[in-house]
Amino acid sequence: MCGYYGNYYGGLGCGSYSYGGLGCGYGSCYGSGFRRLGCGYGCGYGYGSRSLCGSGYGYGSRSLCGSGYGCGSGYGSGFGYYY
């Protein structure tokens, strides 16, 4: 589920608008893409379809975010969902 903010299963992200995906992380989601996780500090810095961010701000293809910033533990998606 999406940490502190919003809906964890599609629709709403963390304080902002996401398109059928998970918007996780610290702060608002800035344009969470189509069926992807917007992870990291500020949430939504890794644009692209059906991909998840890597560590921090980075990009990643079909990989979950690590701990600290982004999905994993603490901020964002605690269980590391991928759809």
Swiss-Prot record:
InterPro entries: KAP6. GO terms for biological process: keratinization. GO terms for cellular component: intermediate filament. Keywords: Keratin, Repeat. The keyword Acyltransferase does not apply. In the wool cortex, wool keratin intermediate filaments are embedded in an interfilamentous matrix, consisting of hair keratin-associated proteins (KRTAP), which are essential for the formation of a rigid and resistant wool shaft through their extensive disulfide bond cross-linking with abundant cysteine residues of wool keratins. The matrix proteins include the high-sulfur and high-glycine-tyrosine keratins. Belongs to the KRTAP type 6 family. This is Keratin-associated protein 6-1.
